[in-house]
């Protein structure tokens, strides 16, 4: 709590978004148990991501049920939640069911699925059309 208070006391002009690493279980569980602290210190948004891209995607670190419960708790507190972490196009239906505020893709929209490579217009277009077909 002291760290959150210190960060918020800086009065940044830009709203800060704490990134929670889902593949760091101790951190994830600590955050889950203390979500109220983020709201108390006037954070409005959290992002669940993976730290190690080699350890797999977000769903390898968190079950669909766990993510659903995390989203339910954050929504009850008035916090928005984004999901990222080596997400793939075929996971979009599961992600849409969860209804996070933001879904973050990086390697899935880069050439050769390499997050350090250039963006692929074709992959961006495919994901756009996939979203469009899922919500139509």
List the predicted regions and their residue ranges:
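Conserved anion-binding
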Residues: 1-60, 66-80, 90, 127
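Extended, intrinsically disordered, low-complexity segments
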Residues: 128-136
């Amino acid at each position: 709590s002291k760290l959150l208070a210190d960060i918020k006391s800086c009065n940044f002009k830009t709203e800060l978004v704490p990134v929670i690493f889902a593949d760091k279980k101790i951190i994830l569980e600590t955050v889950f148990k203390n979500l109220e602290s983020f709201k108390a210190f006037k954070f409005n948004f959290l992002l669940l991501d993976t730290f190690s891209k080699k350890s797999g995607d977000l769903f390898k670190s968190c079950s669909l049920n766990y993510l659903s419960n995390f989203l339910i708790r954050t929504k009850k507190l008035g916090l928005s939640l984004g999901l990222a972490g080596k997400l793939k196009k075929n996971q979009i239906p599961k992600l849409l069911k969860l209804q996070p505020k933001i879904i973050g893709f990086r390697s899935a929209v880069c050439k050769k699925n390499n997050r350090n490579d250039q963006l692929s217009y074709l992959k961006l277009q495919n994901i756009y059309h996939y979203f469009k077909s899922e919500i139509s």
